[in-house]
Curated annotation (Swiss-Prot):
This is 3-isopropylmalate dehydrogenase. The lineage of its organism: Bacteria, Pseudomonadati, Pseudomonadota, Alphaproteobacteria, Rhodospirillales. Binds 1 Mg(2+) or Mn(2+) ion per subunit. Catalyzes the oxidation of 3-carboxy-2-hydroxy-4-methylpentanoate (3-isopropylmalate) to 3-carboxy-4-methyl-2-oxopentanoate. The product decarboxylates to 4-methyl-2 oxopentanoate. It comes from Rhodospirillum rubrum (strain ATCC 11170 / ATH 1.1.1 / DSM 467 / LMG 4362 / NCIMB 8255 / S1). SMART domains: Iso_dh. The record marks Y144, K195 as: Important for catalysis. It catalyses: (2R,3S)-3-isopropylmalate + NAD(+) = 4-methyl-2-oxopentanoate + CO2 + NADH. Substrate binds at R99, R109, R137, D227.
């Protein structure tokens, strides 16, 4: 009998509720077939939360997130709230507060190319076919949070903008541990990325990751400067297995890697916190794509990135590799059969909507399970 686990669903804005509804169908199928015992609570976040509760993230929702075994988020934001709200009430602030209050410091951004979609990439098919890279980005430190920061007036009439790139040892070590552990479950290769040639924070990063590498003799550790890494991702992306890097470089490199795949509608992500004594981590999972308000409510959204985010949850929060593989292989199956939502549509393929993609995925899962 599977152990009961609590998941908090935060559908959010735009296409969020539609894509999350398809995840609920996948989860219900896993529950009904006796593979899992998930309990779901629903709450509001982003613009939907502001409209109903006057804040992009209510304290009660934070409490639910802290009590849950994992959080799954749809999407937040949209033009409805962009111009009218002060910065601290914008939908995206709800997401940032969630990450902060859950103490999520490691952002996992996989860049996978399914064989059926290899031609959608802007790179040559042979460069990206079979690509499976995982970028681990430090999420709560570095230049986005370092002090001092700000814009000040100078005596000569000019203005000065200051941001501070700063990392302490523990911030580097904890995210590097996540990356080493991931590499151990994948291809046993880890590339640490910084600018140790010109930045002291990068030099400290390299020294600490190298020291930690002694605890992981089975992992082949390499180091690369961030500018070279960006070039290599475009030149020969399949040389990488797991990449670990800081907040700024991770922000840039993960978006670079995302476009190797051809569609943001296919990309999941995870954000992880520290492990407790039992090895459990606070975690939030979400698709990389935005809320796409222009197609919301029209059954046009691609649910696969959110479904693949749920697959990451199965794998990394609940250690259910077999169930995660089932979901991943079902996604491969429906794509191989030529089913496409509008964002990944190609001539000669079959156009389906959000619900139609969900129908096909459930049928594929049932077929694979038998």
């Amino acid at each position: 009998m599977p152990v009961s686990k609590k998941i908090l669903f935060l559908a959010g804005d735009g296409i969020g509720p539609e894509v999350m509804a398809q995840v609920r169908r996948v989860m219900d199928w896993l529950n009904q077939t006796g593979r899992t015992a998930f309990e779901v609570e629903d709450a509001l976040v982003g613009g939907a939360a502001y409209d109903a509760q006057g804040t992009p993230l209510h304290d009660d929702t934070v409490a639910l997130a802290l009590a849950a075994d994992a959080v799954l988020l749809g999407a937040v934001g949209g033009p409805k709230w962009d111009a009218s709200l002060p910065f601290e009430l914008k939908p995206e602030r709800g997401l940032l507060r969630l990450r902060k209050d859950l103490e999520l410091f490691a952002n996992l951004r996989p860049a996978m190319v399914f064989d059926a979609l290899a031609e959608a990439s802007t790179l040559k098919t042979e460069l990206v076919s079979g690509l499976d890279v995982m970028i681990v980005r430090e999420l709560t430190g570095g230049v986005y949070f370092g002090q001092p920061r700000g814009i000040s007036a100078l005596p000569n009439g000019e203005r000065r903008g200051v941001n501070t790139q700063v990392y302490d040892t523990h911030e580097i070590v904890r995210v590097a541990k996540v990356a080493f552990d991931l590499a151990g479950k994948r291809g046993k290769r880890l590339c640490s990325v910084e600018k140790a040639n010109v930045m002291e924070s990068g030099l400290l990063w390299r020294e600490e990751v190298t020291k930690l590498g002694a605890d992981y003799p089975e992992i082949a550790l390499s180091h690369m400067y961030a500018d070279n890494c960006a070039m290599q991702l475009v030149r020969q992306p399949k040389q990488f297995d797991v990449i670990v890097t800081d907040n700024l470089f991770g922000d840039i490199l993960s978006d670079c890697a995302a476009m190797l795949t051809g569609s943001l509608g296919m990309l999941p992500s995870a954000s992880l916190g520290a492990a407790d004594a039992a090895g459990n981590r606070r975690a939030m999972y979400e698709p990389v794509h935005g809320s796409a308000p222009d197609i919301a409510g029209q059954d046009k959204a691609n649910p696969l990135a959110t479904i693949l985010s749920f697959s990451m949850m199965l794998r990394y929060s609940f250690d259910l590799a077999e169930e995660a593989d089932l979901v991943d292989n079902a996604v491969r199956g429906v794509l191989a059969k030529g089913l496409r939502t509008g964002d990944i549509f190609q001539p000669g393929k079959t156009l389906v909507g959000t619900t139609g993609m969900g129908d096909a995925l459930l049928a594929e899962m049932a077929q694979l399970a038998n």
